Amino acid sequence: MTIQTVTDAIRYVGVDDNTLALFENQYPVQPMGVSYNSYVILDEKIAVMDSVDARAAEEWLSNVAQVLEGRNPDYLVVTHMEPDHSGSLMRLAQKYPEMKIVGNAKTFTLIKQFFGTGALSEDRMLEVGERDTLSLGLHRLRFLLAPMVHWPEVMAAYEEEEKILFSADAFGRFGSLERTARAPWAPQARRYYYNIVGKYGAQVQALLKKISALEIKTICPLHGPILTEDLGEYLRLYDLWSQWKPEEPEGILIVHASIHGNTAYASEALKSKLEGKGAQVTMCDLTATDLSYAVTSAFYCGKLVLACSTYDGGLFPPMKEFLEHLQTKGFRNRRVGLIENGSWAPAAARLMRTKLEEMKDVHLYETVVSLRGALNQTSEAQMDALVAELCAE
């Protein structure tokens, strides 16, 4: 990735990764890729803001050296210790032995865990706490602890002179800068938020409260583009997402897990009936869609219909895994309808209900559509009743 000028004194030195298949070894990021963002603040003293994944170390070190133009960095500020951001930390520390590492107490605990207790001498560790500052000359960083957004050591850094928020993983987005330069921010930022950060909405709210008093002109996250325009919209979405509120309160998502096609056919029939009533409906086939997209869509809409076949007396595995992911990510504040299928002993509705009742503020529609194979007159009447409930609000 080409070095970018953020301001006269601040450079982007991050690296695009267009070969990674799975982010965190579970979320598909092809063909869009992902970026590992890092920045350099050039002043009387020089601060490097975070490192990158070890797989991108060589390009990153070259970028940093090019920006330094023979100078040595004074500080490496570590806002997040997850390996995609700390994987090259020790490479820079070894290259510049006089450079101090800036972090909070939990940062240094994790450095010792990842790199060994003797990786850094005590005199190279500069520990900061809430609202502590670090002067670089004209520029000054103020630190805001953001525990569990989404790791315990996370902190943001606010550069007071140019009013830049270095936000760690907050406001991040899937997609390399090269491949997604013209892509809208929200779709992959939404997917990133709900699957990576989403469980920790309360902690995100705490960070949003801290930064609400700041004048922010630029947000520099650790993944995705630097944000400079319409910051109010990014903040609005993060506020909405972190309260688990739907972006489309009346939107209906039908999620189906069908073995031989009858449950999928019933889902299509439901979609057609709802659209005939003017409803906004989206479909998701769990047997053909990555869970990260299904989870994101479930949070986007205010209403959800789950259609699942019974399998070995339990839930068809794609639906079981989907519900487990929803619960892990804090799914709440939604209304849910159920469609089950079981040729001789349908149990899916009961099992889905049990799982949903463990979630906060999830309200189930009264009508359950119960299939015994294919949709018939009886189950279609149930479907009509469910349509009436879904469209009554």
Predicted regions and their residues:
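Metallo-beta-lactamase
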Residues: Q4-D8, V102-V154, Y200-L208
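Short, charged N-terminal beta->alpha structural module
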Residues: V255-K277
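Active-site neighborhood of phospho(di)ester-bond hydrolases with catalytic His/Asp-centered motifs
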Residues: M49-S51, P73-M81, K100-N104, L165-D169, ...
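Short N-terminal or domain-adjacent regulatory/targeting segments
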Residues: C220-E248
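Short acidic active-site motifs
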Residues: S88, T289-A294
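FMN-binding flavodoxin-like domain, especially the glycine-rich phosphate-binding loop
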Residues: L177-I219, H223-I226, A269-T282, A294-E393
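Active-site metal-binding motif and surrounding structural segment of the metallo-beta-lactamase
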Residues: E44, R55-V102
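Zn-dependent metallo-beta-lactamase
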Residues: M1-K45
